[in-house]
Design a protein with these regions (language model features):
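Class I SAM-dependent methyltransferase "Motif I" SAM/SAH-binding loop
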Residues: 22-24
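Class I SAM-dependent methyltransferase SAM/SAH-binding core
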Residues: 27-66
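Short conserved loop adjoining the S-adenosyl-L-methionine
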Residues: 67-73
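A short SAM/SAH-binding and catalytic strip from SAM-dependent methyltransferases
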Residues: 80-90
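S-adenosyl-L-methionine-dependent methyltransferase catalytic module, highlighting the catalytic core
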Residues: 89-100, 104-197
Length: 197
C-alpha cells in the first residue's frame, strides 16, 4: 500500500463521507470502504472510470473543475487530491470551490524544489529529466503542468484562508503540526491536511 494512503486512512474517521478527486483506479476508495467510509470518486480518464465501475465503486467521469461545482454545500467530510493538484488548470480556483464541498481537504504532491530534483535539472539542463511518469512524457505533453514546492503550496493555502492542520513527509512517515512543514530541500512527497473552519 502507498505511504500516502496509509496516512490518509489514519486521518479519516469511520463513517465519514469522502470525495476522492482524480481517483485513478479506485484503490484508495476501496481501502476507505474497508474502514466503513463512504467514498465517491471523480476521474477524467474514461478507461479508469469503467475499471472502477467494474469493481463496484462509485466514480463519476468528467472534469473535476466542472463536476465539483455541482455538489451541494458540505456534502463531504473530506476531499482528497493525491498527485492531482499539479495537473489541474487552476489549482487556486479548484481549492476555493472545494471549500463549499467539504471543511477538510487532504492534498498530496511531489515537492518540485527538493535538492535532488534541482541537482538533476542542473546537471541535465532538461525539464524532461524531472518527469517521473512514463518515458513518453515530455515537458510539452505532460499532465504535470503546475510544479510547486512545499513553500509555494503553504503560501497558496494561507492566501486562500485555509488553516493548515498538519503536514506529512510521506516517504519518511513524519508528521509536522502547528504550521510547521517538512523541509523544502529534502522532502520528496508531502501531504497537507487543510481546513476552512
Amino acid at each position: 500500500m502507498r505511504n500516502d494512503y496509509k496516512i490518509i486512512l489514519e486521518l479519516i474517521p469511520e463513517n465519514s463521507k469522502v470525495l476522492d478527486i482524480g481517483c485513478s483506479d479506485g484503490e484508495l476508495i476501496s481501502l476507505l470502504a474497508e474502514k466503513n467510509i463512504s467514498a465517491q470518486g471523480v476521474e477524467l480518464s474514461q478507461e479508469k472510470v469503467i475499471s472502477c465501475l467494474g469493481k463496484g465503486l462509485d466514480v463519476i467521469h468528467g472534469d473535476i473543475n466542472l463536476i465539483v461545482e455541482d455538489f451541494p454545500y458540505n456534502q463531504f467530510d473530506y476531499c482528497i487530491l493525491t498527485q492531482t493538484i499539479q495537473a489541474v488548470q487552476k489549482p487556486d480556483v479548484l481549492l476555493n470551490t472545494l471549500k463549499k464541498v467539504s471543511k477538510n481537504i487532504i492534498i498530496g504532491f511531489n515537492n518540485s524544489a527538493r535538492l535532488s530534483k534541482t541537482i538533476k535539472f542542473l546537471l541535465s539542463g532538461s525539464f524532461d529529466s524531472l518527469l517521473k511518469k512514463s518515458n513518453s512524457d515530455q515537458w510539452y505533453n505532460t499532465d504535470y503542468i503546475h510544479p510547486c514546492s512545499i513553500k509555494d503550496f503553504k503560501k497558496l493555502s494561507l492566501d486562500l484562508n485555509f488553516k493548515i492542520v498538519s503536514t506529512y513527509d510521506v516517504i519518511n512517515a513524519i508528521q509536522f503540526n502547528n504550521g510547521k512543514i517538512p523541509s523544502n530541500l529534502f522532502c520528496k512527497e508531502v501531504l497537507f491536511h487543510l481546513t476552512n473552519e
